Each structure stands twice: as structure tokens, then as C-alpha cells.
Amino acid sequence: MRYTSAERVAQGGLVAFALVFAVVAFAVLFRGGEAGPGASPTPTAPTISRAPDVTITQATCCKQTARLLLATWESSAHINAAKVAVTPDPGFECSASIDANGLKGTFSCRGLLKGATDYVANLQLTTPVGTFPFEHRFKTMGERLTDVKWFTEFEDPTGEPLSCAAASCRIIQNYTTGKDPLTAQAILDLGRQFNRSNDPGLDPVAIATVLQRMDASNHYHYYRFDTREDATGAAVYWLVRSGKPVMVISLAGQHGPVLMGFQGTFGTYYDDPSNRITGVVVEDPQRGDLNPQTQNHRPDKYRTAGFQTGQLIGLDEWYGDEWWLRFAYPASIKMPDGSFQNIERNDGAYPTPHWEKKFVILVDDGDADNPPDREGRVKFR
């Protein structure tokens, strides 16, 4: 069939009209009709999953970290779920928690991690828009703490040896906070008001209290044990658990060296069968003092610079020498004039005898709700 030129033009116009009609109909159909006066179509933006800002805080982190993992996290966005995985695998459960407000929480492990090991805690937090990973790296402490600065108890070389515990408080304060606000004498003067006994120096309550007064992040409490072996095992346990030095009350209640290391192995919990302690590493505020003017105090006991950086003491000496743990805490001590002075706790807070015939240590147990004048209450065995 043939068409004239006029017919072809008419057919082309019809096709063009149909095409325009189809385009308009398509637009109306898929835009839901014409918008009202003054309205504009709402653009559709792609969903953006942005990770929240998260801060992770871990005490003693990150080069000689406590072997008990306990860290806190805080998020800028509400968290619906949290979990953590630790590598290398410690062989026991690690978990994460969320506080009621959904903006912070903790993550921890059930046992002690291996010493001198690089770990990565992989924290996963879930918000309404997605799940996001956060990596926390740290290295656990080895058998001993390093960079524990030593201080003497003989700030006055001609003074009486009453500042041993105060000097050890200064050592602990400096290591745990990096600050050195008070001399041993100033710590002794400050701490005596907190004594709960007639101790001429600082008793266990005063030691714990003055450490917390100097820095609120320190939560030291005293613990009592029936045997020197149990006290030593607990001291090493708390050393590696807290990553902080331990003070041991020695010399029959009259001295307070700082335990900052051990020789041997310590497993994943207090009564771990693999635990083998063959020696302890201590700093001593008196026996590290090499000033000739102070040598008249206990000249029968050797002095060495090792007590300024950490002296290894074998268990035979540690258990058998009266300077260390040969004798338990007594009810009274002999004074320079030959008289005896009672040093038992006497404020009525506990039945007596309380310290007598016990081996006493002071540790940071992290128990912020327990006042420092109370005995430690954390169950660890």
C-alpha cells in the first residue's frame, strides 16, 4: 500500500503525539501525580552507616598491663549489642556488657591472661545502623614490673627508721600515677591520723587510706593470711592481676617492702596447679639506701643497689629471715627504749586479735565501693 506525502506527515505527527502522551503518563504514574502548589519532590538519599566514636579505657595499659583483662568503653551512639573476642585465644570466656543507658559498658575475661604477651581485644558494637569493630591492643606484664622508681626512707640520714611504709607508699604512688607530690616524711605525717592502732609508723589501715588520699584511682586494701606461703602466693596473684606493686608487711609488723615481681610461673587463677613461685622481687626503702650515714641501722643486714631496682629473694630467705616473713604480725613490738607497744587494731571495727598472728599484705583490688579502712573483701580463691 502506498501513502501520499500528506498521509506520511499525518502518521508521523500521530506517532509523536503518542510518544509524548506515554512519557507524560509514565511520569504521572510513578510520581504519584502533580505536586501541590509550592511543594517540591522529596529526594531519596542513600543510607550512610557511620561508626560511633568509641573510647576504650584500661588501667595499667598498655606495655605492662594487668593480666586480668577489665576495660571500659564509651560510645557516642546508643549501643544495642556488644561482644568481644581476644586473640590469641586465652582458653577461657571473655565477654562484653552494656550499661542501662546504652552508651557505655565493659569487656573482660574470666581468668588471667598469659604474661609478657601481645593481645588484641576485638570489640564489636551494634547500633541501629550497623555493627562496627574496634581494636584494642595491649601487652601483659611479665614476671616483674619495670621502671618502678625507688625512694629511701632515710630522707634525714640521722632520723629514726619510721618511714619505711611511707617510702613504699611513695614508690607505689609514683609508679601508679607518675606523680610524686609528697616525700616519705610528708606521707608519714599525713598518714598517721588514719592509724587504727598505736603503731609508731603507719599501720595497714593508714597505708591503704593514704594511698587513696593521694590518688583516688588507687584502691588498696589489706588482706590477712594464716601462713607465709599463702600470703606470698596471694601477693604474686594480686601483682599480676592488678599490674600494680604490692606492699608486704614484714619484720614482724615493723617493715613494708614493695613486691614488684616474682621468679617462676603463674597460671590463669590463684590455685592453678601450674603455679610455681621460687622467689620474689622486692624494692626495699631501707636496704637499698647505700648512704654510709645510715649504715648504723641494722648493720647485720646486707644492703645492695639491687633493692633500688628489684632484688630477687629466694623463698628460703623470704620465709626464713626475720626481716621478711619468718614471723607473723605481733600484738606488740619492742621500742628503742626497751618498752613494748601494742600495735593491734583497736578501733573496735573487728574482733581482736585481728592482725596478730597473721601475715598481712596490701594490694589494689579495684574495689572502689569498699572504704580503705576496711579489710579487703574480693574473693579470688
Enumerate the predicted regions with their spans:
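N-terminal non-catalytic regions of secreted/periplasmic and cell-surface proteins
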Residues: 39-83, 115, 124, 134-143
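Surface-exposed, short loops/turns at beta-strand junctions within beta-sandwich domains
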Residues: 110-118
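C-terminal region of N-terminal signal peptides and the immediate post-cleavage residues
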Residues: 24-47
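Aromatic sugar-binding surface patches on proteins
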Residues: 101-108
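Active-site-adjacent structural segments surrounding the nucleophilic cysteine of cysteine proteases
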Residues: 139-200, 315, 322, 326, ...
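Conserved active-site-adjacent core of cysteine acyl-enzyme catalytic domains
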Residues: 186-347, 351-357
